[in-house]
């Protein structure tokens, strides 16, 4: 965070205005999902007068003041937030409790944040204003900030906590607000069944900016039905830390409270999330070697699990069953020959999964005598990069046991072990330094089959805190590194402040519904997204999920139906779902060999190129992706479903009928694209792929090639086992951001 500090002394009355120069050119890249109303936030300001500080913009005014050595929150009328003397609370393990008002207020300063056009985080591409306060109590020191960037419809506060001596903590409450519900008439409630779920009302959203937060209104579930009868509703965020803050170490935590545009809770939160996530949404199509080179071949005994202290790199034993550098190079060479040289495209990264390492060391086994040197060079020739799988707590199966065995007597392969933590960060950072890594797949931070939070032990809590800390530490090396944090994550939207992608839950592969095994696989994958995100955590974005994308392999327990058309449907769903990360678990020989309806081979490479074109072409609208239709499989019936995105200018729509019989869906384009109620417009759609049949024998009832009023009822008919993809334009030429011009 680049900033300039100005200490306030005596009587100062001034307006500090953020500069508009450069905002609009940046905004196209920094903010692809915009607060969905006509009036926008505009430039952030800071007004200071004597002991008063007012952060504001076109949408909100947030006031603070200093009285008798206490920094006081004076409220925010637009968000119905009441004044309070308490900015945060802390509790130590010995049951000592104190708040900001109990600490010594050392200083209050104003801050100006400059825009960084190259920042990975969208919000940092905008200028802003802030207030910084320093509090002390004994050996403890807290730096607290209130931050308002240009274009923000929300306020963030940040805490950095340090201590001169070790102090054992219990919890911290960085968010302590009270809502005047007499005025708001809409009480914030927890939306979602996970740790790190959002507090949401018709007017505001709030929460700690960590998936480990417990956000609450302190109302028992039995009383939720009558919550709006209460005059005042608390909003608190609790950060549980049953561990020791070591002397000289710093803990950081933050929170947000923001406005909800009328009838637009999802997009209002998403507009905030896209600005504040660790790295802005961007296409990340990757090849992953798991099925082609690794599955069932990654468990070589590695010295039979016995470790010789003289064998510091754990190279003894037979790793010949694991994948080799030669195999990896062969894969990359074939992608260059069949894909890059023909279509001018490549995955953003070639990712090499479990099996490359000498167990426990996160260095290379003898099958990689030069590490990833050659595959990195080959990938760079296509403008691509590489990445790899690492299991922070060891991984799975026998290889996982061997890795954990290596750390026996060394403090354990736990992220709470300082020696192992530092070693893991170093190994990850070395991969960036040596091989220009673009991607890490951090897998298995817990063993839960379907997670809604961390393992509920102190060790489980701290393992999750540690992976968050690791990702923040390694990102210092490369701001745009892409993290796919897999098993052990859950559907909290605040994971995206750390990780770029999270896991959809349950098995890598499975079957649900009807149709052949490939159709059932697609249904299984998408049903879990509907269950765990759309249904149970509806505010959590679905625009960067690990779903297992496209699986086309001879190896492992996966679909063995090799129908060309079915594979194309799987590809179009994998891209049409709008996830920035599309995983290609594809054997190149199958991409070569599978024949189309005319008996020709090689067509799947072309279909993949078309899909990547579609993603790139629609990258400006896909961050808005959201669910359309029903549950892919509700236990009894397969239902039409899909994904849509809209940004006021463009739109995309992907629909799938997973049933073995034709089906219909009756809707409006307003509902499909989640268009705000005050906007009156029409949308013109076109088919995204030339082979899609529109009309008889294909999809019907969805007008294509002509303007359709968004409030007109339409009944869409789809043939069995079908996928159709569309893109189009909004004929109203409306821009949410035009108020910022």
Predicted features along the sequence, with ranges:
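N-terminal secretory signal peptides that target proteins for export/translocation
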Residues: 1-9
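Aromatic- and carboxylate-enriched substrate-binding clefts and catalytic-loop regions
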Residues: 347-552
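Conserved structural scaffold segments of CAZyme catalytic domains across common CAZy folds
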Residues: 113, 118-142, 146-157, 161-397, ...
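Bacterial N-terminal signal peptides
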Residues: 14-24
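Non-catalytic C-terminal accessory domains or segments of carbohydrate-active enzymes
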Residues: 32-41, 87, 105, 627-631, ...
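Boundary at the C-terminal end of the N-terminal hydrophobic targeting segment
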Residues: 28-30
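Acidic-aromatic substrate-binding/catalytic surfaces of carbohydrate-active enzymes
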Residues: 32, 50-134
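Active-site-proximal substrate-binding groove within the catalytic cores of carbohydrate-active enzymes
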Residues: 57-58, 93, 248-249, 467-696, ...
């Amino acid at each position: 965070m680049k900033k300039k500090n100005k200490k306030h002394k005596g009587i100062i009355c001034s307006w500090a205005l953020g500069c508009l120069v450069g905002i609009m050119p940046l905004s196209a890249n920094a903010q692809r999902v915009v607060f969905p109303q006509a009036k926008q936030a505009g430039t952030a300001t800071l007004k200071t007068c004597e002991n008063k500080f007012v952060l504001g913009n076109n949408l909100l005014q947030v006031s603070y003041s200093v009285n008798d050595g206490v920094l006081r929150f004076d409220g925010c009328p637009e968000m119905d937030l009441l004044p309070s003397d308490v900015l945060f609370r802390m509790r130590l393990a010995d049951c000592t409790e104190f708040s900001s008002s109990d600490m010594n207020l050392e200083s209050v300063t104003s801050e100006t944040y400059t825009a960084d056009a190259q920042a990975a985080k969208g919000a940092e591409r905008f200028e802003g204003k802030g207030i910084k306060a320093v509090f002390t109590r004994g050996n403890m020191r807290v730096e607290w900030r209130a931050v308002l960037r240009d274009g923000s419809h929300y306020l963030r506060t940040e805490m950095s906590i340090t201590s001169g001596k070790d102090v054992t903590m219990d919890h911290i409450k960085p968010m302590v607000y009270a809502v005047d519900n007499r005025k708001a008439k809409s009480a914030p409630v927890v939306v979602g069944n996970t740790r790190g779920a959002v507090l949401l009302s018709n007017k505001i959203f709030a929460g700690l900016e960590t998936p480990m937060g417990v956000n609450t209104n302190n109302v028992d579930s039995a009383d939720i039905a009558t919550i709006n009868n209460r005059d005042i509703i608390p909003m608190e965020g609790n950060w549980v830390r049953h561990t020791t803050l070591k002397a000289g170490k710093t803990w950081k935590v933050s929170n947000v409270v923001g406005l909800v545009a009328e009838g637009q809770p999802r997009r209002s939160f998403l507009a905030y999330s896209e600005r504040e996530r660790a790295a802005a949404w961007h296409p990340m199509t990757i090849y992953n070697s798991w099925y082609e080179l690794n599955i069932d071949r990654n468990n070589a005994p590695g010295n039979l699990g016995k470790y010789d202290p003289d064998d510091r790199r754990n190279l003894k034993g037979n790793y010949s069953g694991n994948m080799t550098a030669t195999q990896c190079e062969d894969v990359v060479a074939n992608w260059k020959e069949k894909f890059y040289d023909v279509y001018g495209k490549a995955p953003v990264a070639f990712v090499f999964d479990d099996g490359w390492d000498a167990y426990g060391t996160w260095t290379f086994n003898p099958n990689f005598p030069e590490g990833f040197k050659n595959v990195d060079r080959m990938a760079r020739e296509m403008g691509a990069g590489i990445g790899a799988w690492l299991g922070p707590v060891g991984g799975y199966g026998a290889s996982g046991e061997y890795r954990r065995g290596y750390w026996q007597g060394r403090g354990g392969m736990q992220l709470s072990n300082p020696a192992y933590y530092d070693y893991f960060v170093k190994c990850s950072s070395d991969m960036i330094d040596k091989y220009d890594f673009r991607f890490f797949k951090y897998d298995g931070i817990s063993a839960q089959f379907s997670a809604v939070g961390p393992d509920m032990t102190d060790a489980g809590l701290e393992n999750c805190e540690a992976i968050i800390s690791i990702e923040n530490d390694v990102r210092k090396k490369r701001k745009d590194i892409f993290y796919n944090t897999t098993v052990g994550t859950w559907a909290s939207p605040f994971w995206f402040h750390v990780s770029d992608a999270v896991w959809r839950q349950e098995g890598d592969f499975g079957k649900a519904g009807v149709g052949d095994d490939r159709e059932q696989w697609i249904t299984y994958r998408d049903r879990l997204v509907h269950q765990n995100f759309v249904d149970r955590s509806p505010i959590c974005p679905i625009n960067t999920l690990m779903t297992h994308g496209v699986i086309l392999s001879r190896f492992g327990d996966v679909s063995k139906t090799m129908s060309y058309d079915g594979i194309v449907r799987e590809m179009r769903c994998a891209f049409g779902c709008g996830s920035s990360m599309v995983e290609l678990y594809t054997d190149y020989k199958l991409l070569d060999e599978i024949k189309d309806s005319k008996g020709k081979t090689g067509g799947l490479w072309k279909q993949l190129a078309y899909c990547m074109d579609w993603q790139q072409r629609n990258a400006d609208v896909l961050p808005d992706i959201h669910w359309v239709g029903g549950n892919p499989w509700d236990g009894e019936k397969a239902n039409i479903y899909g994904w849509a995105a809209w940004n006021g200018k463009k739109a995309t729509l992907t629909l799938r009928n997973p049933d073995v019989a034709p089906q219909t869906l009756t809707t409006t384009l307003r509902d499909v694209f989640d268009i705000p109620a005050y906007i009156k417009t029409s949308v013109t759609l076109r088919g995204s792929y030339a082979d899609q049949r529109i009309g008889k024998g294909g999809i019907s009832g969805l007008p294509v090639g002509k303007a359709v009023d968004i409030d007109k009822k339409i009944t869409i008919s789809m043939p069995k086992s079908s996928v159709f993809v569309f893109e189009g334009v909004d004929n109203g030429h409306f821009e949410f951001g035009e108020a910022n011009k």
